[in-house]
Amino acid sequence: MTAKRIIQTIRQNDPAIRSNREAWLYPGLWAMIFHRWANKLYRSGCFFLARLISQWARRRTGIEIHPGAEIGHGLFIDHGAGVVIGETCIIGDNVLIYHGVTLGGTGKDEGKRHPTVESGVVIGAGATILGDIKIGTNAKIGADALVLTDIPAYSTIVGEPARNTRLEASLRSEIAALKVRVEALEKSLNQLNSISPKNMSS
């Protein structure tokens, strides 16, 4: 992702910015520029130099992105302080990450051990997402949420442990519909019970 594209992303996501020059003051811009270089080196096998760049970028920006992480277009890291993105993370396009977010592993497993974040996801400040799990397209992860399992697309997740508020709303509506049906059945049963045997035989 070019610096021009990163600046466009910042301007699209942050109403506080007033000019393209101001975008160069954003730590998220520099974190992405350095990651682009580090990722190229990492993929070419220059692991030490790639890590050197990523660690230098962490000191300069407060954002730690492992050079092995695969990041799509349009990632916006707002504020940025304390963001950690692990080695095997895969991040889609147009993802928004706020400060204090961790996309980490759950142990010493090898191979794919970090989250996959699909396009359009928003991750609130302080959220922790751990393990080889998938965050579905356009899902929203609330601030300080702890996520340890796959999250369906278009879900809204809050709390620790994380709860799917969209799913809860769906369950509430289903329960309400069942309640109406039960009340209708009870009314029908009461009507049947009120009919005397004499009336039934006639």
Predicted regions and their residues:
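Terminal amphipathic alpha-helical/low-complexity segments used for targeting or macromolecular assembly
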Residues: M1-T61, L171-S202
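Structural signal for interior beta-strand "rungs" in well-ordered beta-sheet cores
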Residues: R58-T165
